[in-house]
């Protein structure tokens, strides 16, 4: 599973986790708000800003009954038709260029999730550096082939997909030209609970499909994302908003700016902590060896006096013989007078 780049940023185990701030519909249909979200994401240290590219008409039909109406009382969007929800949540296509331009000015990558083939054509006209396939679209093989044919890196959320479905999607992507692929473990509930996140799947995904892996995290807070890095995640995606109290279609499970800054710093710290398999003192620990216990003279000893548990003891610092040698020393005679506080060495043991 080779590392690769999105823009100038390396995606892989030898680079810090690639953190994506997902705007979704948290702009609340205000371009000014959208641009402020971009600025806040950049200030928080996110590496990329992601949009979703669709219209209500490319997503569904304008019907407000039956399966086109959200009746689940536990849903964040209960009482809305699918069409009305997507009307509220979509990012107008004419906003994409100024949003992407502002992100670029701030040194941040920007790309999007297309939900149909027309969105891919539109995003190609804006020369996006990568694409994301949403979890509900990961079985849309024609869409995956369309994105793969661009030759750009592709990120796919796994959501509810079975191994067989993921295998079909990954094969389709690779056969159509995708060489740089990331699979994101994703739980398609909003919000998701930590218990349903199952991030132990992350290394299994990497093993099965030989690609970079990560997490699209819908849980509250940053704990699951940080843990995902320890499981091998090289990409972390989180929804982002300026203030959850302002509301918005996805605001309730989105990170605020200070939380995004924490996500960026703590996932990088987790990555730094991974290191490699290592035993023994590191270079940084060499000075700490002195704080080990070792054998010291704890009472003045005369020449010829025998060593006993009363005049030698294992204490700190660690400049004397290792404590494991005490049985070999006890009962033997001192070659010379030894002052209390002297580190014991073989040359004074008779």
Stretches with model-predicted labels:
Residues 1-350:
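Catalytic cores and adjacent flexible loops of soluble metabolic enzymes
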């Amino acid at each position: 599973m080779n590392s690769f780049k999105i823009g100038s940023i390396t995606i892989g185990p030898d680079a810090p986790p690639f953190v994506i701030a997902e705007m979704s519909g948290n702009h609340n249909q205000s371009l000014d708000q959208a641009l402020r979200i971009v600025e806040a994401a950049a200030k928080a240290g996110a590496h990329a800003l992601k949009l979703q590219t669709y219209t209500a008409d490319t997503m569904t039909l304008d019907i407000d009954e039956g399966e086109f109406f959200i009746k689940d009382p536990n849903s964040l969007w209960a009482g809305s038709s699918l069409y009305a929800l997507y009307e509220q949540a979509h990012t107008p296509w004419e906003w994409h260029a100024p949003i992407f331009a502002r992100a670029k000015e701030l040194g941040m990558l920007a790309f999007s999730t297309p939900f149909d083939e027309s969105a891919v054509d539109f995003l190609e006209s804006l020369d996006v550096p990568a694409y994301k396939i949403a979890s509900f679209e990961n079985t849309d093989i024609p869409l995956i082939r369309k994105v793969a044919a661009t030759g750009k890196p592709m990120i796919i959320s796994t959501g509810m997909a079975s191994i067989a479905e993921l295998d079909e999607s990954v094969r389709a992507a690779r056969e159509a030209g995708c060489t740089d692929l990331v699979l994101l473990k994703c739980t398609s509930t909003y919000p998701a609970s930590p218990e349903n996140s199952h991030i132990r799947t992350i290394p299994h995904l990497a093993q099965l499909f030989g690609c970079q892996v990560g997490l699209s995290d819908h849980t509250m807070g940053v704990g699951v994302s940080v843990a995902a890095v320890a499981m091998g995640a090289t990409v972390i995606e989180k929804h982002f908003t300026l203030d959850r109290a302002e509301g918005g279609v996805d605001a309730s499970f989105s990170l605020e700016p200070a939380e995004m800054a924490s996500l960026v710093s703590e996932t990088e710290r987790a990555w730094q902590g991974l290191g490699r398999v290592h035993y023994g003192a590191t270079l940084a620990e060499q000075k700490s060896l002195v704080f080990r216990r070792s054998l010291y003279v704890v009472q003045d000893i005369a020449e010829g006096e025998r060593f006993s548990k009363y005049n030698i003891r294992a204490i700190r610092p660690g400049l004397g013989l290792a404590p494991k040698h005490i049985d070999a020393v006890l009962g033997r005679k001192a070659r010379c007078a030894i002052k209390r506080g002297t580190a014991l060495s073989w040359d004074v043991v008779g």
